[in-house]
From Swiss-Prot:
Membership in a protein family: Belongs to the YopR family.
Organism name: Yersinia enterocolitica
UniProt keyword Calcium present: no
Main location: secreted
The protein's name in its UniProt record: Type 3 secretion system regulator YopR
Length: 165
Protein backbone atom coordinates (compact mmCIF):
# COMPACT_ATOMS: atom_id res chain seq x y z
CA UNK A 1 0.00 0.00 0.00
CA UNK A 2 1.51 3.24 -1.08
CA UNK A 3 0.33 6.69 -0.14
CA UNK A 4 1.08 9.54 -2.43
CA UNK A 5 0.94 13.02 -1.07
CA UNK A 6 0.90 16.04 -3.22
CA UNK A 7 1.30 19.64 -2.21
CA UNK A 8 -2.47 20.27 -1.93
CA UNK A 9 -3.08 17.31 0.38
CA UNK A 10 -0.19 18.35 2.67
CA UNK A 11 -1.53 21.90 2.85
CA UNK A 12 -5.04 20.67 3.62
CA UNK A 13 -3.63 18.25 6.21
CA UNK A 14 -1.69 21.06 7.90
CA UNK A 15 -4.66 23.39 7.85
CA UNK A 16 -6.91 20.70 9.36
CA UNK A 17 -4.42 20.12 12.20
CA UNK A 18 -4.27 23.87 12.75
CA UNK A 19 -8.06 23.99 12.77
CA UNK A 20 -8.16 21.21 15.35
CA UNK A 21 -5.67 23.06 17.56
CA UNK A 22 -7.72 26.26 17.33
CA UNK A 23 -10.98 24.41 17.94
CA UNK A 24 -9.78 22.58 21.05
CA UNK A 25 -10.07 25.62 23.39
CA UNK A 26 -13.50 26.41 21.98
CA UNK A 27 -14.56 22.78 22.42
CA UNK A 28 -13.35 22.70 26.02
CA UNK A 29 -15.18 25.98 26.72
CA UNK A 30 -18.34 24.55 25.16
CA UNK A 31 -17.94 21.42 27.30
CA UNK A 32 -17.60 23.57 30.43
CA UNK A 33 -20.73 25.56 29.50
CA UNK A 34 -22.63 22.34 28.85
CA UNK A 35 -21.58 20.87 32.21
CA UNK A 36 -22.64 24.09 33.96
CA UNK A 37 -26.00 24.02 32.18
CA UNK A 38 -26.56 20.38 33.16
CA UNK A 39 -25.74 21.19 36.79
CA UNK A 40 -28.10 24.16 36.78
CA UNK A 41 -30.85 22.10 35.12
CA UNK A 42 -30.27 19.42 37.73
CA UNK A 43 -30.59 22.06 40.46
CA UNK A 44 -33.79 23.37 38.87
CA UNK A 45 -35.24 19.86 38.67
CA UNK A 46 -34.30 19.23 42.30
CA UNK A 47 -35.99 22.47 43.37
CA UNK A 48 -39.10 21.53 41.38
CA UNK A 49 -39.26 18.11 43.05
CA UNK A 50 -38.85 19.75 46.45
CA UNK A 51 -41.67 22.19 45.68
CA UNK A 52 -43.93 19.32 44.63
CA UNK A 53 -43.07 17.50 47.86
CA UNK A 54 -43.78 20.67 49.87
CA UNK A 55 -47.21 21.18 48.29
CA UNK A 56 -48.10 17.47 48.47
CA UNK A 57 -47.53 17.24 52.22
CA UNK A 58 -50.48 18.13 54.40
CA UNK A 59 -49.75 20.28 56.37
CA UNK A 60 -46.86 21.74 54.36
CA UNK A 61 -43.49 20.40 55.46
CA UNK A 62 -41.43 23.27 56.89
CA UNK A 63 -38.21 21.24 56.71
CA UNK A 64 -38.56 21.11 52.92
CA UNK A 65 -39.31 24.84 52.85
CA UNK A 66 -36.17 25.46 54.89
CA UNK A 67 -34.12 23.48 52.36
CA UNK A 68 -35.64 25.60 49.58
CA UNK A 69 -35.07 28.86 51.47
CA UNK A 70 -31.43 28.26 52.44
CA UNK A 71 -29.81 29.13 49.07
CA UNK A 72 -32.10 32.15 48.70
CA UNK A 73 -31.20 33.35 52.19
CA UNK A 74 -27.50 32.96 51.43
CA UNK A 75 -27.84 34.86 48.15
CA UNK A 76 -29.80 37.67 49.81
CA UNK A 77 -27.31 37.94 52.66
CA UNK A 78 -24.43 38.02 50.19
CA UNK A 79 -26.15 40.73 48.14
CA UNK A 80 -27.80 42.88 50.83
CA UNK A 81 -26.12 41.78 54.07
CA UNK A 82 -23.79 44.77 54.40
CA UNK A 83 -26.22 47.53 53.39
CA UNK A 84 -27.20 50.19 55.89
CA UNK A 85 -29.53 53.14 55.81
CA UNK A 86 -33.01 53.44 54.39
CA UNK A 87 -34.34 51.16 51.69
CA UNK A 88 -34.77 52.90 48.33
CA UNK A 89 -37.62 50.94 46.71
CA UNK A 90 -36.90 52.17 43.17
CA UNK A 91 -33.39 50.73 43.32
CA UNK A 92 -33.49 47.93 45.86
CA UNK A 93 -36.74 46.12 44.99
CA UNK A 94 -35.74 45.38 41.36
CA UNK A 95 -32.44 43.98 42.63
CA UNK A 96 -34.27 41.82 45.16
CA UNK A 97 -36.64 40.60 42.45
CA UNK A 98 -33.73 39.71 40.16
CA UNK A 99 -32.16 37.62 42.93
CA UNK A 100 -35.49 35.89 43.57
CA UNK A 101 -36.02 35.31 39.83
CA UNK A 102 -32.91 33.13 39.78
CA UNK A 103 -34.59 30.70 42.16
CA UNK A 104 -38.33 30.84 41.48
CA UNK A 105 -40.52 32.75 39.09
CA UNK A 106 -43.88 32.03 40.74
CA UNK A 107 -45.28 34.64 43.10
CA UNK A 108 -46.70 32.15 45.59
CA UNK A 109 -43.33 30.42 45.87
CA UNK A 110 -41.55 33.74 46.32
CA UNK A 111 -44.00 34.62 49.06
CA UNK A 112 -43.34 31.38 50.95
CA UNK A 113 -39.57 31.71 50.54
CA UNK A 114 -39.50 35.36 51.63
CA UNK A 115 -41.59 34.60 54.71
CA UNK A 116 -39.23 31.75 55.59
CA UNK A 117 -36.15 33.94 55.04
CA UNK A 118 -37.71 36.71 57.13
CA UNK A 119 -38.47 34.23 59.90
CA UNK A 120 -34.87 33.02 59.82
CA UNK A 121 -33.23 36.45 60.02
CA UNK A 122 -35.51 38.08 62.61
CA UNK A 123 -33.90 36.48 65.71
CA UNK A 124 -30.38 37.34 64.49
CA UNK A 125 -30.79 41.06 63.84
CA UNK A 126 -27.53 41.87 65.63
CA UNK A 127 -25.64 41.84 62.32
CA UNK A 128 -25.15 45.09 60.44
CA UNK A 129 -27.26 44.56 57.32
CA UNK A 130 -30.07 42.39 58.69
CA UNK A 131 -32.45 45.24 59.61
CA UNK A 132 -31.98 46.58 56.08
CA UNK A 133 -32.70 43.18 54.54
CA UNK A 134 -35.67 42.69 56.84
CA UNK A 135 -37.15 46.03 55.79
CA UNK A 136 -36.51 45.25 52.12
CA UNK A 137 -38.26 41.88 52.40
CA UNK A 138 -41.18 43.53 54.21
CA UNK A 139 -41.55 46.08 51.39
CA UNK A 140 -41.55 43.30 48.78
CA UNK A 141 -44.10 41.32 50.79
CA UNK A 142 -46.35 44.40 50.97
CA UNK A 143 -46.52 44.21 47.18
CA UNK A 144 -46.41 40.45 46.75
CA UNK A 145 -49.11 39.41 49.25
CA UNK A 146 -51.94 41.54 47.78
CA UNK A 147 -50.85 40.67 44.25
CA UNK A 148 -50.92 36.93 45.00
CA UNK A 149 -54.32 37.33 46.68
CA UNK A 150 -55.73 39.05 43.61
CA UNK A 151 -54.37 36.34 41.31
CA UNK A 152 -55.70 33.62 43.60
CA UNK A 153 -59.11 35.29 43.72
CA UNK A 154 -59.23 35.59 39.94
CA UNK A 155 -58.29 31.95 39.49
CA UNK A 156 -60.78 30.59 42.00
CA UNK A 157 -63.71 32.96 41.56
CA UNK A 158 -63.66 33.88 37.89
CA UNK A 159 -66.45 31.41 37.11
CA UNK A 160 -68.89 33.15 39.46
CA UNK A 161 -71.02 35.94 38.06
CA UNK A 162 -70.88 39.24 39.91
CA UNK A 163 -74.53 40.11 40.53
CA UNK A 164 -73.92 43.34 42.45
CA UNK A 165 -73.19 45.55 39.45
Amino acid sequence: MTVTLNRGSITSLMSSSQAVSTLQPAASELKTQLEHKLKSESAEKTREVLWQQYYASNPPDHAVLEVLATPVREALLARFGQHQGPVVPAIDLPELRSVLQQFDSFGKRREAILLQVLEGIKPNESQVGLPYLSELINKELMILLPYNSIVDSLLHNSHQIDMET
